[in-house]
Amino acid sequence: MQHSDMVMLFDNMYCVNKRLLDAADHLAPDQFTASATATTRDLRATLVQELDVELSWLPRLQDRLEEGDAELKAENFPDAASLRERWKQDERDMRTWLDTLTDAHLDADVVSASTRNRRPLWQYLVHILTHAAQQQADAATLLTAAGHSPGEIGFLAYLHARDAKDAPT
């Protein structure tokens, strides 16, 4: 796995997160927390769960397990704006760390502080990305059902927008 490819995949993840939060800005407070039938969580809980997973893996991969243990609570995020602020910090931290990595780092075996499994670092990062894609699809489904679709969130849509210089960063 090349570093530039991994950074691009994380760029896509953060672009989709931004689109989801932008769409969620248009929801009434009761829509943000409305019970879901199409997914296992309401929109707020889905987004908080995704952020929680992203937050927890960075310290795990840096052998700082105790920092990744505290689980975020959905009720601490009353709206998309409060969630966005917390996500911005996570994105900064993750991007700062990703910028320190090389292709060799990505291919090197690491031991997750939580699972104690030894795998190449890139495999753990792909786990973060694929988990995000699942949660993002759930969030997009809920937003669309509420009348505020985030639009196309697939990877090729991101690439087309990026190539056209329209991808938000």
Q: What spans do the regions from the language model cover?
A:
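Short, contiguous alpha-helical
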Residues: 7-73, 115-169
